[in-house]
Regions:
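Short, well-ordered loop/turn sites that connect or cap secondary structure elements
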Residues: 123-124, 143
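Ferredoxin-like alpha/beta domains used as RNA- or RNAP-binding modules
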Residues: 1-111, 138-210
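Conserved, well-structured core segments that form or line functional sites
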Residues: 115
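Glycine- and Gly-Pro-enriched alpha-helical subdomains that act as flexible
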Residues: 127-130, 135-137
Length: 210
């Protein structure tokens, strides 16, 4: 099934949400960041305040849209992760985020193998990443505990990944990462403190539960 993806200027997405979504790697932490230069929503009515107070539904919708943009996930995938989360024992919001956090493209980004989730998706799609020693080209693959993720150094595009050993390791504790070797392992399931803190998963759960 063909899935539509946003292919326009990603900086517009950050401006629309009114906060940094870190979609462009190093640019997001520089003075060139669109939020710093144009701290207002895009469009012909930019700078004007929204009319009236946001409803509960509007806040839930905005939270869902923000999560989609941060993780570069389609609507059908979001709904799928919610359905999967409701079938598990535990807090639905936490389980929902665990599924998204364990997507291969997100794990590649979290490990520090890519500067953004968008770049991580490209790396996976182009065969630059292995899972348990085998090349994987599916960005949405959900990795499991003890899965090993590594850089496929036999690919022609591996130069993009050179210099990993010079970077600082900012990976979360649930990922045991060796940047010098270009390897990582899922040590355990991510908990609430290790996942994306800018997302209110409860609001997303409430949106889909209606």
């Amino acid at each position: 099934m063909f899935i539509m993806r946003y292919i326009g200027p990603v900086c517009r997405l950050c401006r629309k949400e009114g906060e940094k979504l870190f979609l462009k790697g190093d640019r997001c932490t520089s003075q060139k960041c669109a939020i710093l230069r144009k701290n207002y929503a895009p469009g012909m009515h930019a700078g004007k305040k929204a009319f009236g107070k946001q409803s509960e539904f509007s806040r839930q919708l905005r939270e869902k849209q923000k999560a989609k943009r941060i993780f570069q996930v389609s609507e059908s995938q979001m709904a799928k992760y919610y359905t999967m989360a409701t079938k598990k024992h535990g807090v639905t919001g936490t389980i929902f985020l665990q599924y998204i956090e364990r997507r291969l493209d997100n794990v590649v980004y979290r490990c520090g193998f890519a500067k953004s989730r968008r770049q991580a998706r490209i790396f996976v799609s182009h065969g630059l990443i292995k899972v348990n020693g085998k090349k994987c080209t599916i960005p949405s693959r959900i990795v499991k505990v003890e899965d090993k993720i590594s850089v496929n150094r036999k690919t022609k595009g591996v130069k993009v990944l050179e210099g990993l050993e010079k970077q600082k390791d900012y990976s979360p504790k649930w990922l045991k990462t060796d940047l010098a070797k270009g390897e990582a392992m899922v040590a355990f399931m991510p908990d609430k403190d290790d996942m994306e803190k800018s997302i209110n998963s409860q609001s997303i759960v409430e949106f889909y539960s209606k």
